[in-house]
Amino acid sequence: MSKAIYLGKQALQNPPKAVEGSFLSMDGDRFYKIANYQEMKPFFMSLVSPSDHWLFISSNGGLTAGRVNAESSLFPYYTDDKIIDGAEYTGAKTIIRVLQEDQLLLWEPFSKYGKGFYSTESNLYKNTHGNRLRFEEINLDLKLRFAYEWSFSDRFGILRQAWIENLDDVERSIELLDGIQNILPAGVGS
């Protein structure tokens, strides 16, 4: 007999889901998709740059990145275990407020602290060239999709792009706070 777990009056929604992998074409590129990657233990990846940029990232979003070497990193240059542990305070951070039926609902995609409040699907995509990595979370309750991608540019260096999509036919009022955190000041060694 399986009983629901509650946090206050909110039932947590965290049934285990099967991890699946597949190739697909997206945005003119070929990607490998890992569906429900959050069910796996965090794993480490690197992105390939055509110049002197580098980026090491965990599947939970924690990362370090920079140019040339560790002494010119944008984020603290730590060992992989510390990068994995630091995902909540280093790298991408998104907080979304949705006005729905006179309620203001808070959603923080990819955060371990918000897991179970909503029914979600999480997918990870890495292109076959190894220079693009996309995180995607679909909130089935709010009918919203949020995704962000890391890549490189000769002109701009390390890039992060983000998207939000309304999957419902109903118009929504959404407030979104998005950015990166724990950036090192220029000239500070790690």
Regions found by a protein language model. Give the residues of each.
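Anionic coordination/interaction segments
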Residues: 1-190
